[in-house]
Amino acid sequence: MFLADIGNSYFHLFDGKTVIHLSHKEAIAKYHQENIYYICVKHALNEKISSIPTWHNISIKMKLAGAYRTMGVDRKALCLSHREGIFVDAGSAITVDVIEKGKYMGGFILPGLNAYLQAYRSISGVLDVSLNNAVSLHELPLTTKDGISYGIIASIKTLIDKHRQGKTLYITGGDGKVLSSFFEKAVFDEALVFKGMQNALDVQSTNNNKQ
């Protein structure tokens, strides 16, 4: 059995040990005969993949106490991975959500690292730089590249630290490893969303056995 998190850009597949990143087309061609339990935020794909008999949409099973109606199913799954903590998914956008005793307390959304860089590029070609993944946050920058990198990372870190309040910080997503390096005792885990999905399935299985 595989678990899949189908995003807007990529198809993320988990075999219980390893996370595999594929294009939507590649995933359908290669895994259409496999038994897959998935969540999907790319609505344009739903009709096509719902016709694959061995694939099962479990989005409705991502039940998170306190979640608001339009909250993304991938965010719900991430927050179901642990009963307490602050959860960050650093992808195209950066989502930050707080969980206390299994209940959703609220969260916020920031642009992703690439979106920040694109915003700078749109202002001036002089600001078209790559991110310095090792920029120091303990001293003021002396170059344009470091100034932009500092502005991006420090603004994200300041907001997350404000709401952390001693909670364990869990980080996932394509830019998660980079972002986690700027926090003390952050837990980077590429499989957090899948662990939340599995927890939701386990809860349903337990409830079914009680009936």
PLM region descriptions:
Residues 1-17, 82-103, 120:
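Gly/Thr-rich phosphate-binding beta-strand-loop-beta motif of the actin/hexokinase/Hsp70
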Residues 2-27, 40-42, 174, 180:
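N-terminal beta1-alpha1 ligand-phosphate binding loop
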Residues 5, 76, 187-211:
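Glycine-rich phosphate-binding/hydrolytic loop that grips phosphoryl groups
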Residues 13-16, 29-32, 45-52, 97, ...:
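Short loop/helix-cap segments at secondary-structure boundaries that form the rim of catalytic
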Residues 33-44, 166-175:
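Short glycine-rich phosphate-binding loop at a beta-alpha junction
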Residues 47-82:
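Glycine/small-residue-rich loop that forms an oxyanion/phosphate-binding "nest" at active or ligand-binding sites
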Residues 106-125, 190-197:
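Gly/Ser/Thr-rich active-site loops/lids in small-molecule metabolic enzymes
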Residues 113-166:
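Active-site rim beta-loop-alpha module in soluble metabolic enzymes
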